């Protein structure tokens, strides 16, 4: 389930970036083109290509929960680590956008890879 949740979020992040590149999502020139938060993927954004901007684009129905995260009391979005576009893969940090997500859960998968590295 972790792999599926990661794939769902990463696919939505890529779709958002693609919509920015196609001019369907308004953004500032200096922005990376990735959303400010995972919640933006659920809340949606106005379709800039729609003549009256009444059409919205949604990328997720809801933010999936990290199935390995130990605390069930936190909201789904807070169960993920978020990496900004400006941070490195080796040392992911939050920032002005969400470029990628990773598991915050301790532990290692059956494949020997820590959940954080999936």
Mark where each language-model region is.
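Low-complexity, acidic interaction segments enriched in glycine
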Residues: 14-118
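Aliphatic-rich helix starts adjacent to a transmembrane/signal segment
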Residues: 1-6
């Amino acid at each position: 389930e972790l792999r599926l949740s990661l794939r769902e979020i990463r696919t939505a992040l890529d779709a958002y970036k693609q919509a920015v590149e196609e001019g369907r999502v308004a953004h500032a020139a200096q922005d990376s083109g990735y959303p400010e938060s995972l919640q933006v993927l659920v809340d949606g954004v106005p379709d800039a290509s729609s003549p009256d901007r009444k059409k919205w684009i949604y990328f997720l129905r809801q933010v999936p929960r990290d199935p390995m995260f130990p605390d069930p009391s936190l909201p789904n979005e807070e169960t993920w680590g978020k990496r900004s576009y400006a941070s490195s893969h080796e040392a992911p940090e939050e920032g002005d956008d969400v470029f990628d997500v990773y598991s915050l859960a301790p532990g290692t998968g059956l494949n020997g890879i820590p959940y954080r590295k999936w």
